[in-house]
C-alpha cells in the first residue's frame, strides 16, 4: 500500500490537477468533428461532402490489410489529416488490450497496433503534404489514437503542426510518453458515458511501476444540456477508476458514436457553459475535485 501511495503521489507531482485552460472554440471543434465523420463516407462521395464544407480533397487511402482509412484535405491553406475509426465498440475494446512497445523514432512506448497503423498513414501521406503549410490531425475512436501518433511524427519532423482534435480516443502511450509529448496541441473530446477513453482502467500493480497507459492533452467532457467540463493529467486518469464493467451497455455504444459527438458539439456552438467535473473520489481522506 505504501508503494502504491508513493507512486500515485509521484503521478500527481508530474501531472498536477490545476492547469489553466483556454475556453475551447467549439466552432473549430465542430469543423474537426465533421471531418472525422467524413472519413466514414464512401470514397466516391467524399469529395462532394468535403466541398460543401469548403474543403478540397487532396488524397484518400484505405489500407486493405488493416482496414485503416484516412483523408487529406485543405481549406484556406490549412492541411488536415482525418483518420477513420470504427463504429464497432466491441472491436475497440479488444484492440485496447495490447502491450506497449518501444517506438525508436519517438523514443517512447506506444500501443503496438496504433503505432503500426500510424506509420502506414504517415508514410503514405508525406508525399502529399505541402511544406510550410499548417497541418492539423483529427479522428474518432481508433482513428483518434492514430491521429495522435501521426501528430507526434509530424512534430518530430518539424512540420508546422497547429492542432490535434480527437473524439472518443483511447490511450496510446504511458506516463513517460505523455510527459515527453506534453507540448502536443491536443484536445481530446469525450462524452460522459463513452468508455473507450477510460480503458484499460487504472491498476494498482501497474501504477507502482509508473508504466500505465496515460492520456496526454486537454480533455473536454461533453456533459449534455449545453454544458462541458475540462480535465487533464491525474484528474483525467482517475475518471478511469470509476469504470468497472468490461461489457459495454447500449448507453456506452450510443455515447461512442460519432453522431452523438456531432450533436453535442453542435449544441455547444450555440450555447456553452463550463461546469466543474465532480469525480466523487477521495484520496487519503481528501476529495479530489
What are the roles of these predicted feature ranges?
Residues 21-138, 142-289:
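Non-catalytic, mobile gating and regulatory segments of ester bond hydrolases
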Amino acid at each position: 500500500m505504501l508503494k502504491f501511495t508513493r507512486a500515485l503521489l509521484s503521478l500527481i507531482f508530474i501531472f498536477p490537477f490545476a492547469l489553466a485552460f483556454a475556453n475551447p472554440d467549439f466552432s473549430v471543434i465542430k469543423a474537426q468533428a465533421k471531418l472525422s465523420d467524413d472519413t466514414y463516407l464512401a470514397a466516391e462521395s467524399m469529395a462532394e461532402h468535403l466541398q460543401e464544407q469548403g474543403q478540397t480533397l487532396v488524397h484518400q487511402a484505405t489500407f486493405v490489410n488493416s482496414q485503416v482509412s484516412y483523408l487529406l484535405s485543405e481549406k484556406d491553406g490549412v492541411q488536415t489529416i482525418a483518420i477513420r475509426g470504427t463504429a464497432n465498440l466491441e472491436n475497440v475494446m479488444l484492440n485496447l488490450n495490447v502491450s506497449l512497445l518501444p517506438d525508436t523514432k519517438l523514443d517512447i512506448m506506444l500501443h503496438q497496433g496504433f503505432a503500426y497503423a500510424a506509420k502506414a498513414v504517415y508514410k503514405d501521406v508525406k508525399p502529399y503534404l505541402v511544406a510550410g503549410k499548417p497541418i492539423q490531425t483529427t479522428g474518432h475512436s481508433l482513428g483518434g489514437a492514430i491521429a495522435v501518433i501521426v501528430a507526434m511524427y509530424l512534430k518530430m519532423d518539424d512540420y508546422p503542426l497547429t492542432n490535434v482534435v480527437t473524439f472518443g480516443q483511447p490511450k496510446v502511450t504511458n506516463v513517460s510518453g505523455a510527459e515527453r509529448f506534453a507540448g502536443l496541441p491536443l484536445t481530446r473530446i469525450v462524452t460522459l458515458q463513452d468508455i473507450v477513453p477510460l480503458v484499460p482502467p487504472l491498476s494498482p500493480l501497474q501504477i507502482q511501476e509508473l508504466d500505465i497507459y496515460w492520456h496526454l492533452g486537454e480533455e473536454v467532457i461533453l456533459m449534455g444540456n449545453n454544458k462541458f467540463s475540462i480535465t487533464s493529467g491525474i484528474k483525467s486518469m482517475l475518471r478511469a477508476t470509476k469504470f468497472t464493467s468490461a461489457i459495454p451497455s447500449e448507453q456506452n455504444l450510443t455515447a461512442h458514436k460519432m453522431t452523438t459527438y456531432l450533436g453535442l458539439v453542435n449544441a455547444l456552438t450555440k450555447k456553452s457553459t463550463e461546469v466543474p467535473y465532480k469525480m466523487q473520489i477521495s484520496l487519503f481522506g481528501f476529495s479530489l475535485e
